[in-house]
Design a protein with these regions (language model features):
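Aromatic-rich transmembrane-lumenal/periplasmic boundary elements in polytopic membrane proteins
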Residues: 76-139, 329-352
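Hydrophobic alpha-helical transmembrane segments
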Residues: 51-57, 165-181, 265-269, 372-386
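Structural signal for the C-terminal ends of transmembrane alpha-helices
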Residues: 2-5, 59-73, 225-236, 272-285, ...
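Start-transfer (signal-anchor) and selected internal transmembrane alpha helices
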Residues: 1-21, 25-103
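Membrane-interfacial loop-to-transmembrane alpha-helix junctions, especially the N-terminal start
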Residues: 5-21, 78-85, 193-194, 239-245, ...
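Transmembrane catalytic cores of multi-pass membrane glycosyltransferases
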Residues: 107, 114, 213-214, 255-290, ...
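Active-site lumenal/periplasmic loops and adjacent helix-entry segments of GT-C-fold
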Residues: 97-219
Length: 397
């Protein structure tokens, strides 16, 4: 396969295709004055057609990848498959969100409830190259500005006002994220399995997370990044996992600049991974020292399952430090103004978001018990994780 379709090249091509697909859908449907989605079956039918085309594109990508990866297969088929699958995921986002909203310039739920401050925040970000607060002049923003700042630059580039840019920027960012996460899954798994997981993740995101686009972007990458994090803190060799360390650091830094709640979950999980990796490595070193003549395959952690003896015990902590300090440095780009003001006593010490706990935050989510298609899929995944936890590094992650 040409280098241009490996790693960053493939991600770049998928990003361009996702942007092109989204632009075609949004621009094309804006040329016709459609009735509101709830009052006509026309947009419903067109949405189904778009979704069917998206799933068909993913299936074509899977079939092409499988045919090309067989002995004697054509490399061109693999390239088509690797591009068709992420493009299908992006089209699924554009069709599911862009077509039903074609009759409106507003995003999901209009400007009601939380969408009011999100639209306002993007409007403020479009008027300044800095990091303004969503409501108050000359105050640093407590809410992470990363996604909104980029949305402001999108508004400047397209010549749209901030409130009008919120819908296309939301759909575009979700489509690009869906394409990139599909690319990442195809790199972590086989191309065909990665395509299926990528489009399934996109569908779940659309069903449950799309009203909060910046949070959905962060959540979409959380599962594959945690697999990379496990490779980072528990590599198969002393030199292995460096790329995974860099990817985890970049993700945590970007997520902290975008949505801190998911960042806390991800960071806590990575710390737990490092603790487990260190403990298992220490146990393996101790057992190996007690029985130096014992065959490696008879020791507690065979190389195919968990190879802690191939790296020193201090390596998980060192990798964790690199990830932690690196991600903090990235996050400070967005958080520094607020932290400087906080150290000076400027922000209020009451009535802020630090004192707010929503209903969802007081519950332990157990989607595998919810029933329905999503619940059954989550339950099947949980069973697989438990069954393969000892033999699969992905299940361990």
């Amino acid at each position: 396969m040409p280098v241009a379709l490996r790693g960053p090249g493939l991600a770049g091509a998928a990003t361009l295709l996702a942007a092109a697909v989204t632009a075609v859908v949004l621009a094309g449907f804006s040329l016709v004055s459609f009735p509101a989605y709830g009052n006509s079956n026309v947009l419903r039918a067109l949405t189904v057609v778009g979704q069917t085309a998206a799933f068909t594109l993913v299936v074509v990508g899977v079939l092409c990848a499988r045919a090309g990866e067989r002995p004697g297969g054509r490399p061109a088929l693999v390239r088509i498959g690797k591009l068709a699958a992420p493009t299908g995921s992006a089209l699924l986002v554009a069709a599911t969100l862009g077509i039903p909203l074609a009759a409106s310039r507003l995003y999901l739920h209009g400007v009601s409830v939380d969408q009011e401050f999100r639209t306002q925040f993007l409007g403020r970000s479009a008027t300044s190259l800095g990091l303004p607060d969503m409501a108050y002049a000359d105050l640093p923003s407590f809410y992470p500005s990363g996604w909104f700042w980029l949305g402001g630059r999108f508004a400047d580039l397209t010549g749209l006002e901030g409130w009008a840019a919120y819908k296309p920027w939301s759909i575009l960012s979700l489509a690009v994220a869906a394409a990139l996460v599909t690319v990442l899954w195809t790199r972590l798994l086989r191309t065909d399995l990665g395509a299926v997981v990528g489009v399934a993740s996109t569908a779940v995101m659309l069903a449950y997370g799309s009203p909060e686009p910046y949070g959905a972007v962060v959540a979409l990458f959380l599962p594959p990044v945690l697999i990379l994090a496990w490779h980072a803190v528990a590599p198969t060799s002393r030199r292995g996992g460096r790329g995974a360390t860099l990817a985890t650091m970049l993700y945590l830094g970007a997520s902290a600049s975008t949505y801190t709640l998911y960042t806390g979950l991800a960071a806590g999980t990575v710390v737990l991974m490092a603790v487990v990796a260190t403990a298992m490595a220490a146990l393996a070193h101790r057992n190996a020292g007690r029985a130096p003549g014992r065959p490696l395959t008879q020791r507690p952690f065979p190389p195919r399952q968990f190879p802690p003896r191939q790296f020193p015990m201090w390596l998980p902590a060192a990798r964790l430090a690199v990830i932690g300090f690196g991600s903090l440095a990235i996050a400070l780009v967005v958080w520094a103004p607020y932290l400087v003001a906080a150290l000076g006593g400027a922000p209020a010490d009451s009535g802020t978001a630090l004192h707010y706990l929503p209903d969802e935050g007081a519950r332990l989510p157990l989607p595998m018990t919810a029933g329905g298609l999503t619940g059954w899929v989550c339950l099947a995944g949980l069973v697989w994780i438990v069954a393969r936890a000892w033999t699969s590094r992905r299940a361990q992650a």
